[in-house]
Amino acid sequence: MNNSHIKKLTLSLARSETEDDVVNILTKANLWDDKDVWKEFDGSDGNWSTIGNQQKSADGALVEKIINSVDAVLIKECLNFGINPESSEAPSSIQDAQKLFFNIFNGKLSSIDTKQRSRIAENIYLVASGSKFPSLDIVDLGEGQSPSAFKDTFLSLNKGNKSKMQFVQGKFGMGGTGVLSFGSPKHNLQLIISKRNQTIKDSDEEWGMTVVRRI
């Protein structure tokens, strides 16, 4: 499958609003039933014991995803400031980060006006489409991940990628997997599309895409 085919497949999946749509698209591409293209999440066949014990409600799982987007935006800003997020020079709290990166007085969103708040909010979008069982999309302008980094970020458990960053909220690298317990009814589907934010300039890789399913 060349890049043109992968791009077409990715766009088709991104436009899908139902589980059946996704299954049909992947079946036509001869991917759904091909065991060779599917890998165990985090490389472990016991991953569900962790994934299935994150949040007790779908609301909590969704909030965790948004928190990860907030972290991604703050990390991007930190890197663009030329600061190593794990260093002593990095902000020691989310309030300090908001004050430094977004010039928010006392680091509290309540201290800024509607215009500034709206401008910051444009970094993250939550979009719902479909009818009875909507498809939920979370889009952020955060740091992003290159395709080669997927296995150690989006598709990992307990890696602690953010454990040394004092200004982020999701430190343990597994809370975002909680949505997999509340996804589409049969296969718990999740589509991930990402690339490294071009403002960071530490990777020349293009877009990456993966589908997560429960088997």
Name what the model sees in each region.
Residues V70-L74, K159, S184-N188:
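Non-catalytic alpha-helical coupling and interface elements of nucleotide-dependent molecular machines
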Residues K132-L136:
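Short beta-strand element(s) in the Bergerat
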Residues D140:
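Acidic ATP/Mg2+-coordinating residue in the GHKL
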Residues E143-G144:
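Glycine-rich G1-box
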Residues T153-V168:
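Bergerat-fold ATP-binding/catalytic subdomain of histidine kinases
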